[in-house]
Amino acid sequence: MSDYRLHDNSTVVIIGGGPGGAACAIKLLQGARASGLNLRVVIFEGKDFSVHANQCVGVLSPPVEDVLSGELGIQLPPSIIKRQIFGYRLHGAHENVLLTGHGATASDIRHGRATYAVERAEFDQFMLDRARALGAEVTESRVTGIEFVRDGSLDEVRVYSESEYERADVVVGAFGLDEAMLSVFEDVTRRDGGYERPSKWLKSYLTTIETTPSFQTEKLGHIVHAFLMPPGCPRIEFGAITPKGDHTLVNIAGERVSSCDLDLFLRMPEVQALLPGFDPARINYYEGRFPSAPARGAYGHRYALVGDATGWLRPFKGKGINTAIITGARAAEVMLAHGVSKRALANYRKSCSDLRGDYRYGVMVRRLMMMGARFFLDPMIDVGKTDPLMYDALFDSVSGHDSYRNIIKRSLKPHLVRKVAARVFSGLRRYKALRAKRMPDISIRKMTVRDIDKVLRIDEKITGKPHAAYYESKADAYISRGPEYCLVAEHLDRVVGFVLGDVRGWEYAAELSGWMEIIGVDPEYHGRGVSRALMTELFARFKRAGVTVVNTMVNWNDGDLIDYFRANGFERGEYVNLVKNLAEET
């Protein structure tokens, strides 16, 4: 049985010149050139990208940069990048957390890849121009009909448009969720197994608000603000505020949302605090949609669908640009390697098993969020502030950096379930109160140089290692510079704990603040309120010095230690430490 291989002078027609269609054309022409094949690629695109708006947020997230460079040999030009995105702030009803991807998987290279906000029309034009430069013919016309001709020895595709007529060996549908083209494909493929459009989708509405660079730097920086199931907006599943340099994009999505829900979202105090003043009557709304269920029959004899038309997107964070580029490139690879028959194109479906396989996990996450977000989201955010595994799960869910399957696999840990349950059923106050027991006869006083040996012995009991030279120099320096902030705790004239603090400012552009450098408690006195007594006294002294913020540093992977500081009022700060491994340099 023939697989109908592409040959010299074969014609491939691609309907749609967006990222999926352009990626398919680029991969086809690159592959044909590498194998010495003379291939004709025709792209039909009815939009003028300089005029028509694309109802898409326009965020390029990993691994799209790797796909562009590795698969298509394309480097993103700086001119189309409006802003690099360094993180997301997830908002619940009462809690919020800054998510930068540096949690339990901080060493994973995937979490170091860049995310960019781009102008979709400019990105689409850039991709189409690259396809044209490789030899793709671009016809600026809308396709009106398709005909699959199988009559004796004649087996071809005929494509009709408002201006041109083409005969092709295969047709690629890269038209998104265009109603007219969806209907055309469903009608003409019905006898051959049949394409059926995605059965479910989410509606989206977006608007752009002009902002000055200074306002955006002050209010948003390089952070996308994400709102899951925002209170007061029951139909909104997801809302976001995305900085784009010269303007800010606001969008919402949900199965039953309308433009009135965007009105409600823009009136939320938390949203208005992130936007400049604007006249609601003078801003434009744009309507769009993206699939939340897979299509059926996304390939067949001499045809393949790519991008949104496949429905092979994440149910929550769709990553539509990524899916379009990846499916477009993979469809091209399969056509070149295997052919354009239905049997040959079955390899296209197999090559996208990673996209399709994640669907049921995404549905599970979406249903859980729909049922319990308003009840569980705040406790999950609260746990995520101190637990790296939960932090990563929230980051990956919002950013789309990892599959839902991996998110669920990493997150279903007994200790996470217990922590969330503790927040839900006991409440944060009781959670903190359980740690607040204190012995009544603990006294706090200033540390002296005579206490250094006692501090050293406590540290050795904690760590099992001697640090005599370190503590002698460290403690002496702190006592000399700020004796008010170096304290010891005594019980019956025995030193049972210590803390070294300092007041300094303008490091990393931070205001004057208190620093809690080291705190230690004799293991025999753990759980008796010694550390809380030390911190209470230290913080009181900081306040008398005019300090309003206290800093400390811990290993992000030490969940128990982070839990401890969280119980004592510490939150994850705005700064993230960056490291460079000089040993890896050649």
Model regions and ranges:
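FAD/FMN-dependent oxidoreductases across multiple families
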Residues: I81, R235, R256-M335, V340-K342, ...
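Conserved acetyl-CoA-binding loop-helix of GNAT-fold acetyltransferases
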Residues: V521, G527-A540, A567
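Predominantly flavin-linked oxidoreductase catalytic cores and closely associated redox partners
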Residues: K27, R130-L275
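C-terminal helical "tail/cap" subdomain of flavin- and related membrane-associated enzymes
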Residues: L336-K437
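Conserved GNAT acetyl-CoA-binding A-motif
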Residues: F542-V554
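Acetyl-CoA-dependent GNAT
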Residues: V449-R450, R457-E511, E517
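N-terminal FAD cofactor-binding segment of flavoenzymes
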Residues: D48-H94
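Glycine-rich FAD pyrophosphate-binding loop
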Residues: L29-N54
